């Protein structure tokens, strides 16, 4: 779908791609705020989905999206010297974040673990199953799996379960604060 003469939005068959920055009602408030201030937002599409199909495997099957085109965002935390360090890790959906080795070393903590879901939801302002790397709290690192960079289409959360954002892998690397990490997913 062409948004204007300059930008062709990413799309999925059977779903209407809309310019995400022009449809804040379809994303979580922190995501809408981030889209409003990010130059890359013009290349981001949003699609409405059945909220019961928000989990990656269900969405992938229902909408014929290959797992390699899915970007899962998990929130990991650890502490050192009383200083908590948090990172959102975006990994290709057919892999799992290497939390115990790579993420732990990147955070420079002795032990890294998934942030409890209630905290991740409360602190991000996003819904369970919809957390996305765009619009996260200040101080959270954004780690992006290098395997996603060459994907022409990556489906990520929108902050809510009833929609997804569509981006290119290249655009993920351009997210505010993004750090591309080789081998982040295994």
Where are these regions (language model features)?
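Extended, low-hydrophobicity, polar/charged segments
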Residues: 1-186
């Amino acid at each position: 779908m062409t948004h204007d003469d300059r930008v062709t939005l990413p799309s999925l068959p059977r779903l209407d791609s809309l310019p995400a920055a022009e449809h804040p009602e379809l994303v979580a408030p922190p995501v809408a705020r981030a889209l409003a201030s990010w130059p890359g937002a013009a290349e981001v599409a949003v699609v409405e989905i059945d909220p019961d199909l928000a989990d990656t495997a269900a969405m992938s099957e229902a909408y014929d999206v290959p797992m390699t085109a899915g970007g899962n965002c998990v929130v990991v935390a650890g502490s050192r010297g009383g200083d908590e360090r948090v990172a959102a890790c975006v990994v290709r959906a057919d892999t799992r974040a290497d939390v115990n080795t790579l993420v732990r070393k990147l955070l420079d903590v002795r032990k890294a673990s998934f942030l409890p879901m209630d905290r991740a939801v409360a602190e991000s302002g996003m819904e369970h199953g919809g957390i996305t790397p765009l619009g996260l709290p200040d101080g959270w690192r954004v780690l992006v799996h290098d395997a996603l960079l060459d994907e022409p289409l990556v489906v990520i959360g929108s902050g809510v379960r009833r929609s997804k954002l569509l981006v290119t892998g290249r655009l993920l690397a351009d997210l505010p604060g993004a750090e591309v990490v080789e081998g982040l997913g295994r």
